[in-house]
C-alpha cells in the first residue's frame, strides 16, 4: 500500500505520538484514520516500533481497532486504522448537563465494560499490554460497539513524559505500582485502568483526577486505603514508596459512587470494581477472570 492510495481529509487531532487525519481509500471508498508519526531524520525509525506495529496488524478482534497497514516513507510512518467516529470520552462529555457530570445507564456501562474486557483479554493472551488505557482510547461505533485503540503504541514509541500535543499524558488511569516506580509491571496495569474507567462510566467523572504523581497516589490511597507490607508485600521497596504516606483506611466504594447514580448500585458491580482496583497488582483480577464475574452473568450464561 502506498500513501497515494489515500486522500487526506480533515485533521482529527494531535495524539501523543502522531497527527491523525480522516482519510479516504480511493480504490475502495472506505474511510480510514491515518496516523502520521514524524520520524527523527537522524535516527530513522526505531526497529522496535516497526516490530511492535507489525504485531498490532495481527490483532484481529471485534473489540480492537483494526490496523490495516503501515506505510513507511523516508521521514514518516503512516498507520492506516479503521475509522471510528466517536470515543468514550466524547460520548460521555456529550451527555453532560450544564456542568454536571452524568454517568451512563448501568446496562450501557455493563455492555461497554464487557467489550473493553473482551478486547483486553484477547490482547493479554497475545502478550501485548496496552499501557495507556483511557476513555479517549476507547472508540465507539454508532451501534454501540466499543473498540480499543492505540494498542501497543505506548510500547512502540514509549510514553513521553512531556508531550508536544494538547493531550496531557494522563495519570488518572495509571496504576499505583507504576506511579511508585515499579518496573516489573504486567497485564495488571491495564486492569487498574479498566477499574478507573468503569467507575467513571458509572458516575460521569474521573475516580482519581490527580495533577501529578504524588497527588495521584494520595487520591488513590484516600479512597482505597494506604498499602503496607501486610496488604501488599514488597510495596515498601518500590523506588517511589514514601514511608510518610498518610495512613488511610479504605472508604466504602458503594457509598462514594451511589450519590452520582439514580438507580441503586448492584453489589456485584462494586465487587467487580474491588477486583479491578486492588492496590497490590498480584491481587487484581485478570481480564479473563473479570469476564466471568457474576455481574456479567447475563452475557456468559445466555
Swiss-Prot record:
Q: Which EC class, in a word?
A: transferase
Give the matching SUPFAM superfamilies: Protein kinase-like (PK-like) (SSF56112)
Q: Which GO terms describe its cellular component?
A: cellular bud neck; cytoplasm; nucleus; Pho85-Pho80 CDK-cyclin complex
What is a single molecular function from GO for this protein?
A: protein serine kinase activity
**What sequence ranges are listed for the domain Protein kinase?**
6-296
Q: Where is the active site?
A: 132 (proton acceptor)
> Which EC numbers characterise this protein's activity in its record?
2.7.11.22
Q: What PROSITE patterns does the record point to?
A: PROTEIN_KINASE_ATP, PROTEIN_KINASE_DOM, PROTEIN_KINASE_ST
| Keywords annotated in UniProt | ATP-binding, Kinase, Nucleotide-binding, Serine/threonine-protein kinase, Transferase
Kindly list the biological process annotations in GO that this record carries.
Answer: DNA damage response; G1/S transition of mitotic cell cycle; lipid homeostasis; negative regulation of calcium-mediated signaling; negative regulation of glycogen biosynthetic process; negative regulation of macroautophagy; negative regulation of phosphate metabolic process; negative regulation of transcription by RNA polymerase II
Q: Which reaction does it catalyse?
A: L-seryl-[protein] + ATP = O-phospho-L-seryl-[protein] + ADP + H(+); L-threonyl-[protein] + ATP = O-phospho-L-threonyl-[protein] + ADP + H(+)
Q: Which residues bind ATP?
A: 12-20, 35
Task: One Pfam family, please name it.
Answer: Pkinase
Complex and partners: Interacts with a number of cyclins.
Functionally, this protein is described as follows: When phosphate concentrations are high it phosphorylates the PHO4 transcription factor thus establishing repression.
Family named by the database record: Belongs to the protein kinase superfamily. CMGC Ser/Thr protein kinase family. CDC2/CDKX subfamily.
Q: What is this protein called?
A: Negative regulator of the PHO system
Q: Which gene encodes it?
A: PHO85
